[in-house]
């Protein structure tokens, strides 16, 4: 069942230790949530798994192969997908274009709309809109998450997917994650403070000061985490 292993991962930035000897095994068919205080290294860990950042030391093993030095593109070809906390803009590219690029095939508008509806966007008008500042932060975030889902990746990484979206969209997104949790044959890894996302997880990883403080099954970890509410944010939305 072993799929992804991080061995003794360390990472520094400006002489500050961000991640300190991280050892972690992620298995197929599991939904993981990484949580912890702000500044604990959660997003950095996600970016290292995707290849956006490179560790100063340690190894990343994917299905028995050392991928530590592989680029983002090379990892994407292996089935890694990533949704940023702050989505990027694509001047001159429409939402429909972006979804087609994500799928890698010619798709019909109905297929694209089906992907958007999963993240709470129901209007066909969005397909013609450009990925630029005319879209709100919440809209950009939902569209980016849709592109990750479109790729059907083996390892899907979502960095705080709840950031910048309204309550209705978050409820819709929670249902998407529930579906992923029950049907995915790969690994889903979500960075989140939100109780409703924590309650979907098979396992929760608690980071603190760049180290894994605790990892365990949802029932066990939720009890621990809610004893210290600093790890969990109130559900405030736009």
Describe each PLM feature range.
Residues 50:
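Helix-to-loop junction immediately C-terminal to a conserved catalytic motif
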Residues 86, 92-108:
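Q-loop/switch helix immediately C-terminal to the Walker
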Residues 156-160:
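Catalytic Walker B motif of ABC-type/P-loop ATPase nucleotide-binding domains
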Residues 148-149:
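ABC ATPase C-loop
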Residues 35-37:
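The feature captures the beta-strand-to-loop junction immediately N-terminal to the Walker
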Residues 4, 18-21:
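Conserved structural motif at the start of ABC-family nucleotide-binding domains
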Residues 58-65, 111:
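Conserved ABC transporter NBD signature motif
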């Amino acid at each position: 069942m072993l799929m992804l292993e991080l061995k003794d991962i360390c990472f520094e930035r400006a002489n500050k230790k961000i991640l300190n000897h991280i050892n972690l095994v992620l298995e197929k068919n599991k939904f993981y949530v990484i949580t912890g205080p702000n500044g604990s290294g959660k997003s950095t860990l996600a970016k290292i798994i995707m290849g956006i950042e490179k560790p100063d030391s340690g190894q990343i093993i994917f299905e028995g192969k050392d991928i530590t030095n592989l680029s983002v593109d090379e990892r994407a070809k292996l089935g890694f997908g990533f949704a940023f906390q702050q989505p990027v803009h694509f001047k001159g590219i429409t939402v429909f274009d972006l979804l087609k690029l994500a799928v890698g095939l010619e798709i019909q508008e109905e297929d694209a709309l089906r992907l958007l509806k999963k993240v709470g966007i129901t209007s066909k008008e969005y397909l013609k809109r450009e990925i630029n500042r005319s879209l709100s932060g919440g809209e950009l975030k939902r569209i980016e998450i849709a592109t990750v889902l479109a790729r059907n990746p083996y390892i899907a990484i979502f960095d705080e997917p709840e950031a910048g979206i309204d309550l209705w969209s978050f409820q819709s997104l929670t249902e998407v994650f529930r579906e992923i949790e029950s049907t995915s044959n790969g690994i889903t890894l979500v960075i989140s403070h939100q109780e409703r996302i924590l309650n979907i997880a098979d396992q929760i990883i608690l980071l603190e000061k760049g180290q894994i403080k605790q990892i365990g099954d949802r029932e066990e970890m939720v009890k621990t985490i809610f004893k210290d509410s600093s790890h969990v944010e109130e559900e405030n939305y736009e």
